[in-house]
């Protein structure tokens, strides 16, 4: 296949492992073949391990991380350590960017409202949670089922478990979205806000 003497051996396409030398080996009948049998591979391994540096190389290969399974187990170990962190995406109508927020850092809806005000610079979020009928923006969230609900409709612990992402909508869009505050919501948020 490759032209001898033209230096095309490097670019030659062939079947086999990369950088593998095809050494012709004579079998018992004197025929030449390009495959190495298992005993030859084992003999080569024994020769390397009998030399002084071979034992260190075996240990080095043993400690070396290769392949995807160790990476997955590494990620699992790190996710166990960060189980208390629960990041959700937060978007605001009119803002050209999304943010991530850790819900685990907040103790309740009032802390969340202050953080949203600070994050997006839209003041009045705390008042919007306390007085649901007034305010320019309304914070809503998507739960596990994919339903959009008003922030504050459920107790804080249930909100923490079910929230997938947050969105700050304009009030007119939220009414068109079909989100109406519950009658008992106002008292609940006032008690949480104190």
Swiss-Prot record:
Q: Which residue ranges does UniProt annotate as crossing the membrane?
A: none
Q: Name the family.
A: Belongs to the Aux/IAA family.
Q: Which Gene3D superfamilies does the UniProt record give?
A: Phosphatidylinositol 3-kinase Catalytic Subunit, Chain A, domain 1
Pinpoint the PB1 domain residues.
85-173
Q: Which domain of life is it from?
A: Eukaryota
Entry function: Aux/IAA proteins are short-lived transcriptional factors that function as repressors of early auxin response genes at low auxin concentrations. Repression is thought to result from the interaction with auxin response factors (ARFs), proteins that bind to the auxin-responsive promoter element (AuxRE). Formation of heterodimers with ARF proteins may alter their ability to modulate early auxin response genes expression.
Q: Which keywords does this Swiss-Prot/TrEMBL entry list?
A: Auxin signaling pathway, Nucleus, Repressor, Transcription, Transcription regulation
Q: Where is this region: Disordered?
A: 40-62
Print the domain comment field.
Answer: The N-terminal half of the protein contains two conserved domains I and II. Domain I includes a slightly degenerated ERF-associated amphiphilic repression (EAR) motif which seems to be involved in the activity of transcriptional repression. Domain II is required for the correct degradation of the protein through the SCF-mediated ubiquitin-proteasome pathway. Interactions between Aux/IAA proteins and auxin response factors (ARFs) occur through their C-terminal dimerization domains III and IV.
Q: Which GO terms describe its cellular component?
A: nucleus
**Pfam families, per the entry:** AUX_IAA
Listed name of the protein:
Auxin-induced protein 22A
PROSITE patterns registered for this protein in UniProt? PB1 (PS51745)
Q: A GO BP term, please?
A: auxin-activated signaling pathway
Record the organism.
Answer: Vigna radiata var. radiata
In which compartments does the protein localize?
Answer: Nucleus
What do we know about what induces or represses this protein's expression? By auxin and cycloheximide.
Motif EAR-like (transcriptional repression) covers 13-17
Q: What is its main location?
A: nucleus
What does the record note on quaternary structure?
Homodimers and heterodimers.
């Amino acid at each position: 296949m490759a032209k001898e003497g033209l230096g095309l051996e490097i670019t030659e396409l062939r079947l086999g492992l990369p950088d593998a030398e095809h050494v012709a080996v004579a079998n018992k009948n004197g025929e030449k073949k390009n495959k190495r049998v298992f005993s030859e591979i084992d003999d080569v391994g024994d020769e390397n391990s009998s030399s002084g540096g071979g034992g260190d190389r075996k240990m080095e290969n043993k400690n070396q991380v290769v392949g995807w399974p160790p990476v997955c187990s590494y990620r699992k170990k790190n996710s166990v350590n960060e189980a208390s962190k629960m990041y959700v995406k937060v978007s605001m109508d009119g803002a050209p960017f999304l943010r991530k927020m850790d819900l685990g850092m907040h103790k309740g809806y009032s802390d969340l409202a202050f953080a949203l005000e600070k994050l997006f610079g839209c003041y009045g979020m705390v008042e919007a949670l306390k007085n649901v009928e007034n305010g320019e923006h309304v914070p809503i969230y998507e739960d596990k089922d994919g339903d959009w609900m008003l922030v504050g409709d459920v107790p804080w612990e249930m909100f923490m478990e079910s929230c997938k992402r947050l969105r700050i909508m304009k009030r007119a869009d939220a009414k068109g979205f079909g989100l109406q505050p519950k009658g008992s919501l106002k008292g609940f948020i006032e008690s949480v806000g104190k």
